[in-house]
């Protein structure tokens, strides 16, 4: 029997994304965003939803660009700190000894130590209530070679951090189950 719950954000875990922006003084800033995902295949696009009160929100509105750096689990403490501190008050990259790198494709920085980077130009902005959704066309991807298998990002090598709003916890990725799109007949 199923139990009814009040509406909430308790979907499946989502990756911890570190959103990189520049402020008006060209200072790099990063923040974690739990709300985001792929929203289109062609052109490849993602979205991140940020509260207007965040420092990064204003930066994205000004620069019309952002990056998403996907941290591996060995950077859990840094990612957690980045999600708590505000770029208005401190230099989070300096505090965590992480290295900002200027994207050569968009007006935003990424974190060099993180294995997978998505470089995005803003193509749509939609206010949804408490959050603003920034849809970014992925104009470039950078990946550490050791995080790839056959030229593609490998989840087991990247070891991304997942956030679950249901239990308010960080999680890791389990093992690969099977190749997708192979069940051509109804299961018995």
Task: Outline where the language-model segments fall.
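Basic, polyanion-binding surface patches
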Residues: 1-188
């Amino acid at each position: 029997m199923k139990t009814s719950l009040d509406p909430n954000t308790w979907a499946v875990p989502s990756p911890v994304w570190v959103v990189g922006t520049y402020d008006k003084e060209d200072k790099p800033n990063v923040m974690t965003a739990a709300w985001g995902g792929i929203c289109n295949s062609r052109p490849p696009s993602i979205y991140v939803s940020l509260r207007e009160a965040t420092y990064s929100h204003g930066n994205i509105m000004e620069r019309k660009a952002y990056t998403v750096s996907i941290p591996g689990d060995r950077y859990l403490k840094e990612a957690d700190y980045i999600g708590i501190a505000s770029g208005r008050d401190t230099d989070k990259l300096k505090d965590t000894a992480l290295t900002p790198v200027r994207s050569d494709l968009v007006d935003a920085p990424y974190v060099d130590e993180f294995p997978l980077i998505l470089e995005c130009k803003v193509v749509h902005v939609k206010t949804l209530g408490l959050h603003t959704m920034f849809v970014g066309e992925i104009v470039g991807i950078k990946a550490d070679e050791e995080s790839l298998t056959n030229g593609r990002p490998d989840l087991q090598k990247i070891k991304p951090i997942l956030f679950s709003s249901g239990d308010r916890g960080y999680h890791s990725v389990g093992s690969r189950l099977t190749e997708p799109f192979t069940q051509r007949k109804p299961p018995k």
